[in-house]
């Protein structure tokens, strides 16, 4: 069992970029919130060096309060936490079904998002 001394400790603050509109290959833009670790002086870690990222794509509203207990744990430990509304859901653009099996853009949208984040 891991003790608190062995696990990572929260060392960063949190910087939020709300509703970043990430373009997909067909021109539709998906609303994305990006939480980045920052230093005590407010300098965003992701601007000066690459950080690992956790990506969640949801049809249940990226601003739902349930996420408020999730993202701080990771961001304070140096991860970027990225959460995106699926195509045609909430703040994202596009027409289409939000059911994964019926949405023909789902795979491409996920791929395009990862590629955008990696640049």
Predicted regions and their residues:
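Cap/lid segment of the alpha/beta-hydrolase catalytic domain
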Residues: 38-118
């Amino acid at each position: 069992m891991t003790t608190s001394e062995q696990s990572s400790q929260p060392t960063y603050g949190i910087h939020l970029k709300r509703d970043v509109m990430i373009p997909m290959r067909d021109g539709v833009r998906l609303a994305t919130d990006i939480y980045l670790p920052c230093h005590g002086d407010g300098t965003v870690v992701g601007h000066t060096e690459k950080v690992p990222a956790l990506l969640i794509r949801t049809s249940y509203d990226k601003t739902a309060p349930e996420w408020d207990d999730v993202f701080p744990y990771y961001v304070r430990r140096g991860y970027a936490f990225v959460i995106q509304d699926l195509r045609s859901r909430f703040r994202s653009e596009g027409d289409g079904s939000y059911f994964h099996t019926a949405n023909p853009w789902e795979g491409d949208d996920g791929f395009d998002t990862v590629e955008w984040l990696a640049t």
